[in-house]
Design a protein with these regions (language model features):
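N-terminal leader/presequence segments that are low-structure
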Residues: 1-13
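Intrinsically disordered, low-complexity regulatory regions of eukaryotic regulatory proteins
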Residues: 4-5, 23, 70
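Generic signal for short, ordered secondary-structure residues
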Residues: 6, 18-19, 26, 33, ...
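STAS-typified acidic loop motif
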Residues: 11-49
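Amphipathic alpha-helical interaction surfaces in cytosolic regulatory modules
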Residues: 41-114
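Short acidic-hydrophobic, aromatic-tinged amphipathic segments that line or gate anion-handling sites
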Residues: 115-122
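A short, charged, amphipathic alpha-helix used as a generic interaction element across diverse proteins
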Residues: 127-129
Length: 129
């Protein structure tokens, strides 16, 4: 099982679109997806594909958006769809965002639904419990 998880790790950010890059890491049986750039109408499809294509195991995961510069309603929609899939599969997940991203998520009252945490360590602790 560990061998499969090691295959998930991507050292460098992968170019998903002109404005979005993605990365995968493994932290104590929790997958951490890290994104940087813009999560918007132009990148939401690639975001969803990147996450779903790399969920080969039934391990909980964190979507780290602390390096996202811009999040629009399409990006929020992609996060909501991901959360709905996780809830259906009973798969643990959490979202971490910088102050701008967190404010956007809280503004539309999705913080609890998306298991929004203030930092990566809080998200990892949440998923270990």
């Amino acid at each position: 099982m560990i061998h499969l998880l090691e295959e998930l790790k991507i050292e460098d950010f992968q170019k998903l679109t002109v404005s979005l890059r993605g990365n995968i890491d493994l932290r104590t049986n929790i997958i951490v997806f890290t994104f940087k750039g813009q999560l918007d109408a132009f990148s939401e499809k690639q975001f969803k594909n990147f996450v779903s294509n790399n969920l080969k195991n039934e391990y909980p995961f964190v979507i780290d958006l602390t390096k996202i510069d811009f999040l629009d309603s399409s990006g929020l929609g992609a996060l909501v769809q991901t959360a709905k899939e996780c809830k259906k599969l009973k798969l643990g997940f959490s979202i971490v965002g910088n102050s701008r991203v967190a404010q956007t998520i809280k503004l539309v009252r999705l913080g609890d639904f998306l298991n929004l945490k203030s930092c990566l360590e809080d998200a990892l602790t949440y998923l270990k419990n």
